[in-house]
């Protein structure tokens, strides 16, 4: 009866979205304060090394296998001022990546070239997005070789689930979380393997490789500059702000941007910049969805820490361009100029004065425009499937792993409010039957678990572009906010079940029976795993498919049902 006693002692305040996010923002402020307080270079290097290693573990960087790239050139086209080589490579066996390599004109620039990887943002057409290929074109016209590729679910890299872009990223993340991974685990691997490919080219100086990206690609280029020491200069655009400045107006973003308990172990935008170990240009936009006020405040922290550490002038820079969230002409020019300065030692203005009018065929690598149609194709879902089978991932296993999370929720302040929703037949001396997830039958009791029905309270104001989770209008915002807090919506609901069980036992003299319907069967399994004697018996009706079966059939598995199950194991 430990859980019931702990819950009875707890204060009662429902974990509204505002309150969860305010706690995350407070932790982000603390992280900023810790970087602001770094006194000297030795302290900065120590803190950088600690964050870098923790971040690499969260990303799964050390688990990236350097399998054969099997890179194949599928043709080169000469555009006069530059050439484009179409390359097909594998970031993992059968996981094809379509790459465009922009090569400077040999008559003007001699190899080996300094180069950079460009990571596209959330565009359905991936590497073919106009502003992204223009960045690579400008780089080639200026003497830099670059490789731009399709991230998962974009361009030619549909994974066969009928989803695109952010929807695919979130779906991958829901499954990856059950393995202690994120979508970023797989997206970073792609970026690292493209750097491997660049470094293997005889026309590239492997000691002079940079990273560039916009929006979601700004996110991944920021991750890459921290994780991969081969990156010698980086220009993330339309991402680096401050986590709290973006979270409040826009809500949690798709899953490659969310880490389990990340704020507690130091995930923070200033940390990304100061832990990179290379020069960084923060490209921001005045009207960005990633608020420019956050970019400016983060840059002030970076400048202060850099000055105390004696970093070279111009090592870190902030550029604010007018206009909205996009890889604008100003961003392109400043990014290429920054890369030229730090990769080639050239200090000069870069102006974009002409562009080639690219057609669809110019940017397509595969014959049918889809890697999924190639012989030997392996989707990321098939890779996840193999891991699920090898590790025996199941609701029962996750419930056992998450026992500590459930007990912690019982001892907190959030689970007791459920008692106010308890209704139905409760008679002293008569065993109660508690039903969750469906309408109570005659003679049964029921209750409303958190973030269900009237107990779902969304953020009071969202002024920015709503996240995927907010747009769905479900409890997924709560689940992701709790996930980032090192908690679990499923574990919280399981704690509420145990609170209800303790109350029903107190009022009737018997442990209640439990009937759990639909996805609440998973919640019930968490509760039983945490306290086996809480219920006299349990019945599961209309259970969801086992995780592995759902993955095989490409069923969507929402964060509320699975991602929130991650136990931090």
Locate predicted features.
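Alpha-helix capping and helix-loop boundary segments enriched in small/acidic/polar residues
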Residues: 123-134, 167, 175-189, 211-222, ...
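Loop/turn elements at helix/coil->beta-strand transitions in domains of secreted/extracellular proteins
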Residues: 112-115, 142-145, 205-208, 229-233, ...
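Catalytic-domain carbohydrate-binding cleft regions of carbohydrate-active enzymes
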Residues: 212-214, 221-225, 236-244, 269-272, ...
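Anion (oxyanion) recognition and catalysis
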Residues: 140-141, 274, 529
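Alpha/beta-hydrolase-fold serine-hydrolase catalytic core, especially in secreted/extracellular enzymes
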Residues: 11-96, 111, 283-433, 438-444, ...
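Cap/lid segment of the alpha/beta-hydrolase catalytic domain
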Residues: 108-192, 199-200, 241-250, 438-505, ...
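Primarily recognizes the serine-hydrolase "nucleophile elbow" in alpha/beta-hydrolase
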Residues: 193-265, 500-567
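Hydrophobic helical h-region of N-terminal Sec-dependent signal peptides
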Residues: 5-7, 11
């Amino acid at each position: 009866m430990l859980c019931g006693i702990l819950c009875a002692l707890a204060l009662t305040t429902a974990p509204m979205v505002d309150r969860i996010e305010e706690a995350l923002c407070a932790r982000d402020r603390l992280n900023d304060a810790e970087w602001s307080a770094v006194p000297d270079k030795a302290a900065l290097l120590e803190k950088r090394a600690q964050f870098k290693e923790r971040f690499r573990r969260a990303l799964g960087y050390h688990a990236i296998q350097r399998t054969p790239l099997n890179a194949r050139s599928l043709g080169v086209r000469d555009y006069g001022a530059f050439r484009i080589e179409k390359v097909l490579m594998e970031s993992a066996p059968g996981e094809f990546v379509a790459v465009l390599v922009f090569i400077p004109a040999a008559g003007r620039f001699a190899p080996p070239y300094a180069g950079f990887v460009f990571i596209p943002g959330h565009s359905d057409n991936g590497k073919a997005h106009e502003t992204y290929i223009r960045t690579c074109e400008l780089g080639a016209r200026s003497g830099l070789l670059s490789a731009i590729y399709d991230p998962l679910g974009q361009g030619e890299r549909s994974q066969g689930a009928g989803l695109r872009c952010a929807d695919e990223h979130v779906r991958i993340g829901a499954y990856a979380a059950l393995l202690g991974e994120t979508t970023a685990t797989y997206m970073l691997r792609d970026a690292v393997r493209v750097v491997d490919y660049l470094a293997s080219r005889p026309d590239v100086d492997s000691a002079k490789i940079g990273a560039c990206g916009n929006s979601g690609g700004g996110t991944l280029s920021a991750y890459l500059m921290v994780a991969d020491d081969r990156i010698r200069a980086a220009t993330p655009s339309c991402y680096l702000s401050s986590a709290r400045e973006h979270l409040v107006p826009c809500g949690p973003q798709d899953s490659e941007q969310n880490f389990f308990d990340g704020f507690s172990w130091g995930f923070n935008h200033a940390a990304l910049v100061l832990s990179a170990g290379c020069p960084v240009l923060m490209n921001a936009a005045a009207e960005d969805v990633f608020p420019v006020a956050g970019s400016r405040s983060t840059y002030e922290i970076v400048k202060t820490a850099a000055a105390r550490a004696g970093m070279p002038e111009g090592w870190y820079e902030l550029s604010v361009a007018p206009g909205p969230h996009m890889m604008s002409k100003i961003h392109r020019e400043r990014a290429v100029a920054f890369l030229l300065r730090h990769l080639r030692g050239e200090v000069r203005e870069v102006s974009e004065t002409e562009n080639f009018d690219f057609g669809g065929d110019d940017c397509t690598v595969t014959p049918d425009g889809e890697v999924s149609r190639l012989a030997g194709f392996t989707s990321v879902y098939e890779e996840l499937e193999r891991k699920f089978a090898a590790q025996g991932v199941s609701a029962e296993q996750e419930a056992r792993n998450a026992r500590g999370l459930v007990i912690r929720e019982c001892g907190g302040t959030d689970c007791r409010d459920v008692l106010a929703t308890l209704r139905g037949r409760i008679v002293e001396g008569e065993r109660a039957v508690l039903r969750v997830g469906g309408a109570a039958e005659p003679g049964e009791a029921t209750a409303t678990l958190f973030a269900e029905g009237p107990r779902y309270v969304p953020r009071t104001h969202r002024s920015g572009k709503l996240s995927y989770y907010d747009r769905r209008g479900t409890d997924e915002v709560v689940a992701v906010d709790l996930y980032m807090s090192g908690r679990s919506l499923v574990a919280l609901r399981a704690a509420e079940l145990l609170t209800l069980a303790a109350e029903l036992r107190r009022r009737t003299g018997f442990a209640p029976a439990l009937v759990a319907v639909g996805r609440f069967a998973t919640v019930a399994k968490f509760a039983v795993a945490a306290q086996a004697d809480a219920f006299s018996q349990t019945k599961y009706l209309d259970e969801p498919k086992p995780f592995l079966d759902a993955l095989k059939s490409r069923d969507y598995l929402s964060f509320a049902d699975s991602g929130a199950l991650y136990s931090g194991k």
